[in-house]
Swiss-Prot record:
Entry keyword annotation includes Lyase: yes
Entry protein name: Chorismate synthase
Record lineage: Eukaryota, Sar, Alveolata, Apicomplexa, Aconoidasida
GO biological process, one term: aromatic amino acid family biosynthetic process
Classification via InterPro entries: Chorismate_synth (IPR000453), Chorismate_synth_AroC_sf (IPR035904)
This protein's record includes keyword Metal-binding: no
Length: 527
């Protein structure tokens, strides 16, 4: 089916090489102010032809609003978004219309609908995900304004290249990065002439992602785009974390969420990995470019963190929160698996280790500037923002410094800044000291961050010739033509973020329809 949701329904329509694609949101609340620029920003993060790492199909993905708004406020009527397909090349698929492509849906599509697809993957194409990004980017604005709930996804690994385990725990358990930080730290500059990479801290690497020392490469021979270097120690190339906190907003405050457009040089190409670990981002770029030259593809893992979800959403038994999220995330092309919290690693733990102990939230807010964080053992503690940085500074790799979001980052919640809602005078709002459950117990949200990881298979369209059978049983050689990604991971985070917001939004309305808004407490409320 092309519709998701019970009360908040999203229907997508259109084909990859048709005239347009789009979506209809039905059941959305009225009088919600929507920033269309934020929707377009998410579409831009997903669109193809962002860099040499992605498909060169040149789609602008400009949002067209057809209905549901009076200026920028919702009417409560169906919202209709449209996105025109501008770079259509159906002829790329003419040569193999009678050959089901390995790894694609051509064969199963034909067996179900008795139609041979003449224009790529049609409804099964990743092109469809642009519609859910538009819908989700609209819904998530309501989630943030009403519940202070925000969602961030990022690339954890590509192939066997992954964020170091210690840093991964830091991001999942302590301080989830903002989207701007993901895009900033995930940006890598590539000099095709010199065959070198440069990360966001101006560290230079060769084509194998090996860092070059200053005496091995003379930076003075390069025209380096100027970024705010006030927090970079030139001698050690290390980062002053406190200064990063102060300068972060200026650092990412530009059109592309990376570096200032006016400072870009023709010598440099900007590659976006959406991996919030600079060194790993460079490794990913090197790996994908090599695979692209070989005509092959690769998959990986994407992490998603739903911050401050309302407590009590999820419908046991068959509409559990993780079941609904899994249904939605697995509907994204190329996603083949999902795990929550400790996931499969939890199978190696004892129950005494895995059980998440409850504590009153009020016990976590005894200091004026204390933050709700998790220590190295995964236990929730009251920790000063900067003291946490100091305690971990010697333990974290140099390339991971600066991960703490600034105190004024809207995605970083201070527990003392919000009103905690209690059910009544006797029952207290609780939180778990650890989060092995991933923010979900018995299919219902606990209020802790919901953490899950998605397994992404390699893109099926590759430029390597393979022997396969046509529809008539004749063996033949096939080399897929067209414009395709070698790795879909850099474009995936906004899709996962949008898909998650659709699920959370629908479950909130289902809960409200039964018990009213007063039964939806959150750990952190907007003032």
């Amino acid at each position: 089916m092309s519709t998701y949701g019970t009360l908040l329904k999203v229907t997508s329509y259109g084909e990859s090489h048709g005239k347009a694609i789009g979506c209809v949101i039905d059941g959305f609340l009225s009088n919600i102010e929507i920033n269309f620029d934020l929707i377009q920003k998410q579409l831009d993060r997903r669109r193809p032809n962002q860099s040499k790492l992605t498909s060169n199909r040149n789609e602008k993905d400009k949002l067209v609003i057809l209905s549901g708004f009076d200026e920028n406020k919702t009417l409560g009527t169906p919202i209709t978004f449209l996105i025109y397909n501008e770079d259509i090349k159906k002829e790329d698929y003419n040569s193999f219309i009678n050959i089901p492509r390995p790894g694609h849906g051509d064969y199963t599509y034909f067996m179900k609908y008795h139609v041979k697809n003449k224009s790529g993957s049609s409804r099964f194409s990743g092109r469809e995900t642009a519609t859910r990004v538009a819908a989700g980017a609209c819904i998530e604005q309501w989630l943030y304004k009403s519940y202070n709930c925000s969602i961030v996804s990022y690339v954890h690994s590509v192939g066997n290249i992954k964020i170091p385990e210690q840093v991964s725990k830091e991001l999942e358990n302590k301080n989830p990065p903002s989207r701007d930080l993901v895009d900033s730290y995930g940006t890598v500059r590539y000099n095709e002439k010199e065959k070198i990479f440069m990360d966001c801290f101006n560290r230079i690497y060769d084509m194998n992602a090996s860092m070059l020392k200053t005496d091995e490469y003379n930076k003075n021979t390069l025209t380096i785009p100027s970024i705010d270097n006030t927090y970079i120690n030139v001698k050690t190339n290390e980062c002053n974390i406190n200064q990063v906190d102060n300068n972060h907003n200026n650092y990412i405050n530009d059109k592309d969420n990376t570096f200032n457009n006016s400072e870009k040089s023709d010598e440099w190409i900007y590659l976006q990995t959406r991996c919030p670990h600079p060194y790993t981002a460079v490794q990913i770029c090197s790996y994908i470019l090599k695979l692209k030259n070989k005509g092959d593809s690769v998959g990986g893992i994407a992490t998603c963190i739903i911050q401050n979800p309302p407590i009590g959403i999820g419908e046991p038994i068959f509409d559990k929160l993780e079941a609904e999220l899994a249904k939605m995330i697995l509907s994204i092309p190329a996603v083949k698996g999902i795990e929550f919290g400790s996931g499969f690693n939890g199978t190696y733990m004892f129950g005494s280790m895995h059980n998440d102990i409850f504590i009153p939230v009020e016990n976590m807010s005894t200091k004026k500037e204390s933050d709700l964080l998790y220590d190295d053992k995964g236990e929730c503690k009251n920790m000063s923002y900067h003291s946490t940085i100091q305690n971990n500074e010697d333990q974290i790799l140099n390339s991971t410094k600066g991960f703490m979001p600034p105190k004024n980052d809207k995605n970083f919640n201070n527990i003392d800044d919000y009103n905690v809602t209690f059910n009544n005078n006797e029952e207290k709002l609780l939180i778990t000291k650890t989060n092995n459950c991933g923010g979900i117990l018995a299919g219902i949200s606990t209020g802790n961050n919901i953490v899950f990881r998605s397994a992404i298979k390699p893109v099926s369209s590759i430029q390597i010739e393979k022997e396969t059978s046509d529809f008539y049983g004749n063996m033949c050689n096939l080399k897929v033509q067209g414009r395709h990604d070698s790795c879909i991971l850099p474009r995936l985070p906004p899709i996962i973020e949008a898909s998650s917001s659709m699920v959370i939004g629908d479950l909130i309305l289902r809960q409200i329809s039964k018990y009213g808004d007063k039964k939806l407490p959150t750990l952190f409320r907007n003032m």
